Design a protein with these regions (language model features):
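Conserved beta-loop-beta element that borders a ligand/cofactor-binding pocket
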Residues: 124, 158-184
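Conserved Rossmann-fold NAD(P)-dependent oxidoreductase catalytic core, especially the SDR/UDP-sugar
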Residues: 77, 105-149
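Glycine/proline-rich active-site loop of Rossmann-fold NAD(P)-dependent oxidoreductases
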Residues: 155, 168, 180-198, 208, ...
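N-terminal Rossmann NAD(P)H-binding glycine-rich loop of SDR-like oxidoreductase domains
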Residues: 3-23
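Substrate-binding strand-loop-helix patch
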Residues: 188-194, 215-228, 244-264, 306, ...
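NAD(P)H-binding glycine-rich loop region in Rossmannoid oxidoreductase-like domains
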Residues: 54-99
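Amphipathic terminal alpha-helices
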Residues: 308-326
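Mid/C-terminal beta-alpha module of Rossmann-like enzyme folds, strongest
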Residues: 204, 230-233, 237-281
Length: 326
């Protein structure tokens, strides 16, 4: 019996693959990209071997072939086209829809034919949209109002996943992630814009200074190891009282708080503050409030293990030990 992880060579997927392999799962990764040296070294430290299969989730025959080659017990569908800039959304509109919707349908059909024990759809806080008040904490009962193609396709895939499960007797669940940071974030074919954590920790690792931006801007960041652990908790739980969970720390972090945390760990790092008129908010406009983690704690007892200092410490250690300086 194996656990299939789509998008297993990407940022979130790579961490899911390693964490599951470290916790008793026989993992098969399915991704349009093969593993690079950085990923091989990262996953190579896992307790169980991982099979990397290269293929396209949009191709139904390639997806169906997985069911012939492996006895698939559980699926974590993390493959996605991440679009967080309107220019890229305009340029790749068809790709976003094909990958995020057709790919999900193909994986659900595989789950149906294999009668998997659990299908997890990895969604995003983007499903809520950004039009909601920034001081409003968003729980799973908050009505989603996504505006861009990324958020729209994530929410649509959630609904498709739920209905497919109802129609075909599958145990399905959606997990909405808040904003991740940590090891294995890098530019890939489906992820082009990096987080401020990636930028600033990279500068520290290279011995460069940091140029600040709009320091009041922020997000509800969560360390990637906590995301992997939270997803495994939902995946392996014998019973799920709900089919939708937020996965988050529930804590809003401003850029100033992140910078303070980095400087505490690397006091020699030089900081430059440009004139206010030149400052640009990291990651673009982002006005939604933090997600609530109450349901995941109440139902399954899950809580995050990493606060900001612990996450930054672990991330900087990985950058140093892996030699990843980009």
């Amino acid at each position: 019996m194996v656990t299939l992880v789509t998008g297993g060579t990407g940022f979130v997927g790579a961490n899911i693959v390693k964490h599951l392999a470290d916790n008793g799962h026989n993992v098969v990764s399915f991704d349009i990209n093969g593993p690079d040296k950085l990923l091989e070294d990262f996953v190579g430290q896992a307790s169980s071997p991982v099979a990397f299969i290269q293929g396209d989730i949009v191709d139904p025959e390639s997806v169906a072939r997985l069911g012939l080659d492996y006895q698939i017990d559980k699926i974590v569908h993390a493959a996605v086209y991440t679009v967080n800039r309107e220019a890229l959304e305009i340029e790749r509109s068809r790709d976003v829809i094909a990958i995020n919707l057709e790919g999900t349908a193909n994986l659900l059909e595989l789950a149906r034919t294999q009668q998997t024990k659990r299908f997890i759809y990895v969604s995003s806080g983007a499903a809520y949209g950004s039009a909601l008040p920034s001081d409003q904490t968003l729980n799973e009962e908050t009505p989603p109002v996504p505006e861009n193609l990324y958020g729209i396709t994530k929410f649509a895939s959630e609904m498709i996943t739920r209905r497919y499960g109802q129609l075909h007797g599958l145990s399905t669940a959606t997990v909405r992630l808040s904003t991740p940071y940590g090891p294995m974030e890098r530019v890939t074919g489906h992820r082009a814009v990096m987080s401020v954590f990636h930028d600033w920790t990279g500068r520290v690792a290279r011995g460069e200074g940091i140029t600040t931006e709009d320091m009041d801007d922020g997000r509800d960041y969560i360390y990637i190891a906590d995301i992997a652990d939270g997803l495994r908790t939902v995946l392996d739980s014998p019973n799920l009282p709900h089919n939708l969970y937020n996965l988050t720390t529930g804590i809003w972090l401003t850029l100033q708080e992140i910078l303070d945390g980095i400087i505490e760990l690397s006091p020699s790092t030089q900081v430059t503050t440009p004139p206010a008129k030149l400052a640009v908010a990291a990651g673009g406009n982002y006005s939604r409030g933090p997600l609530s983690s109450h349901r995941l704690f109440s139902d399954l007892g899950w809580t995050p293990s990493y606060d900001l200092k612990a996450g930054l410490t672990d991330y900087l250690k990985w950058r140093t030990e892996s030699g990843y300086l980009d």
